[in-house]
Amino acid sequence: MNMRTDPALLANPQLSFATVASGICIPYIERGTGEPVIFVHGSLCDYRYWDAQIAPLSAHFRCIAPSLSHYWPAAEACIQNEFGWQEHVAELAEFIVAMDLAPVHLVGHSRGGSIAFQLAREYPRLVKTLTLADPGGPLQLDGMREASLPSAMNALRAKVAGMIEEGVVEPGLELFVDSVSVPGAWKKSTDAFRTMAIDNASTLPKQFLDPLPAYSRDTASQIACRTLLIDGQKSPRMFRNNVESLEGWIYLAERATITGASHGMNVANPAAFNRMLRSFIDY
């Protein structure tokens, strides 16, 4: 099954691998007992992104954080499908079934929020509650012809992809991370975050060739479970617009804002994020 496995991957005693129905291998970490909570990472991240949630919340729930295919360490250790949001939705659904977890409390951040949203739409029986933190993707407002990201953002992404493909990795990552958070975010980030982002840099050009689907009134009306929408007070307007619209479109939605935080609100203020999430799940 393994293609090119770095022994360091196996150094984490909590790291496990699940083989799902399609034959691919999904790395994940798991801690705690109780109702299952699955954490879905976003761009440049993997299961490590949720460290500040897994440890404290595992005292109350069965916390599981997978790495989606092509993200570390799956890129080194696992058989994978093609890169794409649809593939990630399908493999995550297969993971929930293979692990006999349904229904789960599903938590997604940024691009992972889009994956979680689409999974809840397509596989409603697998999801008990849905939490979307700064969900990524374009917004299809009523009366608009076609939803897409702003042209300036697409131009920036093309530049970032070119830099990474040419080996100018850290400056490219800095440009992207600052664009989805606040200027200077990359330089202020922790060594652990920068290491994780560098480990996953090769996924970014692939991601830019695979646009996320738009949120719309129609698609949001198909979410049947209780939903918590979290944004950061200082998150870029695109994410806050998504949260604001989804709050009005999803029938059983509630919204919470983390004061002083930007896009990585669960890392910047984990105590507030964890408190909101636990209160919502325990309701």
Predicted features and spans:
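Flexible "cap/lid" loop of the alpha/beta hydrolase fold
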Residues: 117, 121-164
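Gly/Ala-rich beta-loop-alpha elbow adjacent to hydrolase catalytic centers
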Residues: 108, 112, 116
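Catalytic histidine-centered segment of alpha/beta-hydrolase-like enzymes
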Residues: 261-274
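Conserved acidic catalytic loop of the alpha/beta-hydrolase fold
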Residues: 86-104
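Conserved HGGG/HGGXW glycine-rich cap/lid loop of the alpha/beta-hydrolase fold
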Residues: 17-81, 95
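Conserved alpha/beta-hydrolase catalytic His-Asp/Glu region
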Residues: 165-205
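Conserved loop-alpha-helix segment in the C-terminal half of the alpha/beta-hydrolase fold
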Residues: 217-261
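Short beta-strand immediately N-terminal to the catalytic nucleophile in serine-hydrolase-like folds
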Residues: 106-108, 133
